[in-house]
Amino acid sequence: MRYGTNTNLSSLLDQKVDILQLMHDEDSAAYAWTIRRTCPAYVETDIHDNLFSAAGTRARGAKITIRTDSRLTLHEAMRWNGKFLFLTSIELSEQRDRQELQAAVCESVTLTAKPQDRTGRDALNRPTAVDVPGFTFPGVLTEKYFRNDAEDVYRAELQQRVLVTPKVIMLRAGDLVQQDTEPPYTVRQVLDLDPYKNEYVIERSWEA
């Protein structure tokens, strides 16, 4: 950082960031990031990448300084100069007048979840299929790897990615996830031990 810890905050915080919170609209079945507040900040991109995903590739890192916000948690995110900042750590300065944040510079996209039927019980306690409605939500797609499978009749290309979502977005293996009109992905693996986010290994295949 170009300033020391004793630098006057007014001269340090010469930029602006939007602090984003996740909101849910029940009528439209949509989760979306909305601005909680806009505040002065100092932001610089890091020379080191940020390992924000346990299963995906790294992203460019950023360091952010803001005045102390007691409500801020890693469940939130930020937007700076049109860039989405996925928060990965929050530290309070020794003077307790500012917070030093680490973030990954990512692209947040809107996706549609199409959950598969769940198994429930009817009035007679017999297993029955329970329809789960679809919903839209924001997520970050990061690359995992590509693989080519040779089959008897045709060759299929299998594309795997890692989907990183806010913690409240709960998917199961077998659920479908789609971005715009692209072919949908199928959730293959759920990684949900992190207290602030969920990760899903998703894949799709098509004839090459």
Where does each model-flagged region fall?
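Short, surface-exposed secondary-structure edge patches
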Residues: 67-72, 166-170
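Loop/turn positions that initiate beta-strands
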Residues: 74-76, 172-175
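A conserved acidic, glycine/proline-rich C-terminal tail/linker
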Residues: 154-173
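Low-complexity, intrinsically disordered Gly/Pro/Thr-rich segments
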Residues: 173, 180-192
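N-terminal disorder-to-order initiation segments that are Gly/Lys/Arg-biased
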Residues: 1-71, 84, 88-159, 191-208
